[in-house]
Amino acid sequence: MPGIFFSHPNALKEVTNKPDEVMAQKKKNFAVPWKNYLKSMLPHLETIKSSSSSSSSDTEKNKLTPNEIIQWTMSLEKLLVSEEGQAVFRAFLKSEFSEENIEFWLACEDYKATNDSEELRCKANVIYQEFIQPNANKQINIDFSTRNSVTKDLLEPTKATFNGAQKMIFILMERDSYPRFLKSEIFFRLAERHHGNNMRG
């Protein structure tokens, strides 16, 4: 998989305008920290499947090890290098009405893996129209300078055309969505339900 951005800009405006009912569902306190909880489950876990209906068709085909799930708690990078992790995280973002962030990030990864110049130009225009241009259906939250830079690069797009925008969205997910994901019902059930099944068996 192509490289993932980690460097943090000096400033980044985070999205906070979520519906009240969605924010209420995200606030759940657990008795033990997630990393310790998952490690305590390690002897009992054999495989873990996604409990989310939107991603179950992907994850149920691929058995996960407890160590893989624990890796997801270490960093957003480790979560996104896993196809199963991407599917579960995407389901969570969909529940928060911010699925466009992971869709854009994945589109950029695919874009950077494209070698044919005509195909690159075509994909650049699709990404711009879907995520970057004003009033786009899945418009992402990037600043004016970054948006303007992408627009200019469309005349002669390169593999680096969306680098700045992708970096901003990665950091937004890392700071805003990822910490909530680790405390979410989706992630909690992913681990807890199978843990319970093994304990009963």
From Swiss-Prot:
One of its GO terms (biological process) is negative regulation of signal transduction. Keywords: Cell membrane, Cytoplasm, GTPase activation, Membrane, Signal transduction inhibitor. Residues 75-191 form the RGS domain. It is found in: Cell membrane; Cytoplasm, Cytosol. The keyword 4Fe-4S does not apply. GO terms for cellular component: cytoplasmic side of plasma membrane; cytosol. It comes from the Eukaryota. GO terms for molecular function: GTPase activator activity. Transmembrane segments: none annotated. It is a peripheral membrane protein. Its main location: membrane. PROSITE patterns: RGS. This is Regulator of G-protein signaling 1. The lineage of its organism: Eukaryota, Metazoa, Chordata, Craniata, Vertebrata.
